[in-house]
Amino acid sequence: MLSALARPASAALRRSFSTSAQNNAKVAVLGASGGIGQPLSLLLKNSPLVSRLTLYDIAHTPGVAADLSHIETKAAVKGYLGPEQLPDCLKGCDVVVIPAGVPRKPGMTRDDLFNTNATIVATLTAACAQHCPEAMICVIANPVNSTIPITAEVFKKHGVYNPNKIFGVTTLDIVRANTFVAELKGLDPARVNVPVIGGHAGKTIIPLISQCTPKVDFPQDQLTALTGRIQEAGTEVVKAKAGAGSATLSMAYAGARFVFSLVDAMNGKEGVVECSFVKSQETECTYFSTPLLLGKKGIEKNLGIGKVSSFEEKMISDAIPELKASIKKGEDFVKTLK
C-alpha cells in the first residue's frame, strides 16, 4: 500500500523541469568540490526548482562555482571557501545537503568512516544550527546510521532541534532496488518502486520487495540473492572503482531526487513520498528509515513499515541490534564534544 502512494522513481527528477511561481528554493551543498558534491551541484543547477545555489568546501569551491555559473539556467551560483566563509554560505537557505566527508575505499565499511566523518558532520551541522536553523538538513555523509543521530544531538545542543527537518538520505538504496528488480523482470525502472526501510549500511538496508509496485514475485533463492545485492551494492561499486572512490554519480542522482521531492513538497505539492532515515517511533530503534509523506514543513506523516513478509520481518529483527549500536555511537560522539 505504501509504495502505491509513492510516485515512480524518476518522476521527481522529471518534475524538476516543470515551471512554477514557487520555484525559488535556496539550496546549499556542503562538500561541493568532492566526488558526490560536484555532480550533485550540477543536477541542482540544472533544476528550475532552485533559484540560489551556494557551494561550500575547504578546497576548490571558487572553481566549481565559476564552472557551474556559466550554465544557462536560472539558479545563481556562489562558492564559499573555508570555515570563515561557511556562515555566509548558509544564511537564508531553505535546504542544506551534506555530502562532505571521506569516501570508502576497498575493504572499508561505511562504519570505518566514522572517526573522520563524525567530526566533519558535527562541525557543519553546528554551523547550520547557528546560521540556518529552520532549513531542511539532508545528510549524505556516511555512516548515515550514526551521522543523523549526530546531527540531531548537535541541533538539540543549540536549542533548535526539529525532527521533521533532519533527513538521512537513503534514496540510493531505493534507486538500486528499483533498478535491480526492473533488470530481473524486464521492466522500465522508472515505473518500479521498492520501499527500502531500516538503515543505510549492510544488513540494516531492508528492501520490501513484497511491497513493490508493480507487484513482483521471486523464488526464495533469487529473493535472497537480490536482497544481498541491494545491501552490498555500494561495495560492488567500491570494488569496481578499485581504490578510485565509491558511488558518486548514482549517489548524486539519488541526492538530487530526494532534494527535488522535498522542494516539491515544500512548494505545496501533495502526495510526495520518499524513504529516509529519520527520528522514528516505528520500531524500538530511535531512528529508522520508512516511507515518509513530505510536506511544507518537512515530514508531514511517517507512513510506517506496513505489511511485510516473514522474510522481511526477520531482516528487521536482525537489523535492530546493529542499528541501535550505530545510533548510540553517534549520540555518544556528540557528548565528547566541547
Curated annotation (Swiss-Prot):
It comes from the Eukaryota. Its EC number is 1.1.1.37. Changing K185R: No activation of enzyme activity on treatment with TSA or NAM. Residues 1-24 form a transit peptide. Acetylation is enhanced by up to 67% after treatment either with trichostin A (TSA) or with nicotinamide (NAM) with the appearance of tri- and tetraacetylations. Glucose also increases acetylation by about 60%. Substrate binds at R104, R110, N142, R176. The modification Phosphoserine is found at S246, S326. The keyword Glycoprotein applies. Keywords: Acetylation, Disease variant, Epilepsy, Glycoprotein, Mitochondrion, NAD, Oxidoreductase, Phosphoprotein, Transit peptide, Tricarboxylic acid cycle. The modification N6-succinyllysine is found at K78, K91, K185, K203, K215, K239, K269, K296, K301, K307, K314, K324, K328, K335. The active site is at H200 (proton acceptor). Glycans are attached at S33. The modification N6-malonyllysine is found at K239, K307, K329. It is found in: Mitochondrion matrix. Changing P133L: In DEE51; decreased protein abundance; strong decrease in malate dehydrogenase activity; severe defects in aerobic respiration, when assayed in a heterologous system. The modification N6-acetyllysine is found at K78, K91, K165, K185, K215, K239, K296, K301, K307, K314, K324, K328, K329, K335. Enzyme activity is enhanced by acetylation. It catalyses: (S)-malate + NAD(+) = oxaloacetate + NADH + H(+). Transmembrane segments: none annotated. One of its GO terms (molecular function) is L-malate dehydrogenase (NAD+) activity. PROSITE patterns: MDH (PS00068). Belongs to the LDH/MDH superfamily. MDH type 1 family. Homodimer. PANTHER family: MALATE AND LACTATE DEHYDROGENASE, MALATE DEHYDROGENASE, MITOCHONDRIAL. It is linked to Developmental and epileptic encephalopathy 51: A form of epileptic encephalopathy, a heterogeneous group of severe early-onset epilepsies characterized by refractory seizures, neurodevelopmental impairment, and poor prognosis. Development is normal prior to seizure onset, after which cognitive and motor delays become apparent. DEE51 is an autosomal recessive form characterized by onset of intractable seizures and hypotonia in the first days or weeks of life, and severely delayed psychomotor development. This is Malate dehydrogenase, mitochondrial. It comes from Homo sapiens (Human).
